[in-house]
Amino acid sequence: MNFVSDLFRNIGIWFHTWLSGFLPSWSVLLIDYVLGGIILLVGILVAVLFVIWVERKVVSRLQDRLGPNRVGPWGLFQAVADVLKLLTKELTTPDGAEKISFNLAPLLVVFPTIMILAVIPWSQNIIGSDLNIGVLYIVALGSIGVMATLMAGWSSNNKYALLGGFRVVAQLLSYEIPMVLAMLSVVLLGGTMSMQGLVEAQGGGFLNLPYWRVFVIPLGFLVYFISALAEMERTPFDLLEADSEIVAGFFIEYSGMKFAWFFLASYINTVLLSAIATTTFLGGWQGPFVQRAPVLGIFYFAAKTLLVIVFIFWIRGTFPRFRIDQLMGFAWKVLVPLALIVLLLVAVVVKLPVSPLVQQAILFVSNIAVLLAALGLLGRRLRVATERQRLGGRI
């Protein structure tokens, strides 16, 4: 029973011990790292195929359609068929393109997202590397994808691709600021930049109830979630590849597997940012009986992450796309000030000489108050703008 309660860790220990019986220590360590990397890659690819299927089913349900239902049971293998189709497509390079940057960009888009997965704590004992600067590591590697998409747009020798690349810089860098500020609020509460440490800091509190940050700083979670939508380039922030404006955006000239790399990066990014939201705000692998049976942690983590992903897909089928001026104004005039207010509140409250429970109650009430005030101001501005348009139309 003890073996089953922490199944994956115990299998790893058994395999490591078995190899140590006839191999030198350096080769055992090398095999451990290589095998761990392979398991991570295979796991994320399977997760991406499943997430693509979930998106198609959720959106089709919202649009009163059936969705994929031909390839495999319930259409589960439709994404596999799409990959096989892309493998047969011709790889083309446009005339006048800067070939080195053009061919390097698809790889640079994918690899940073895979590297970030190494610091995500999937359960209590399953993590690639528990860095004490995990949050800083995520922020640093996350910026590489911005440069890669700009490389793709600039090197394609296409005006629509270049315009999409410019939008990458404007949108992703703008929304990265409030997202990082929201994560810093969680870091201040947890007192660590380790992703595993942030999860452990959300464990058993008053009456053994979890201290999930979504219930402590709900406004911080809202800022992070909206910013993450923009970082994923998801509706209503999909201006980087708006079909009606700039055709396919920065990867318009890519075909075959080069295009598939961008497609893969988009879905890995969706899984990754949802996993980060789970880690920082939803308690990560924390859940009932996880201390007695750590193997449950990976299922709790997967369920929470899937819940966030489904909500993202629901938004895709519900909201229209922003205009570029609305998108930029919302980032700098709304999200950045709100993120700074949350960060300031956390910095002040954690220094108060009161119990953690009282601190969290103060933070929750103040977050709700700021959120209601912000909604009131936004509603007033919207009414004023609508009235001006109405009067202008009469004139």
Q: Predicted segments — roles?
A:
Residues 1-395:
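Selective transmembrane helix interface/packing segments
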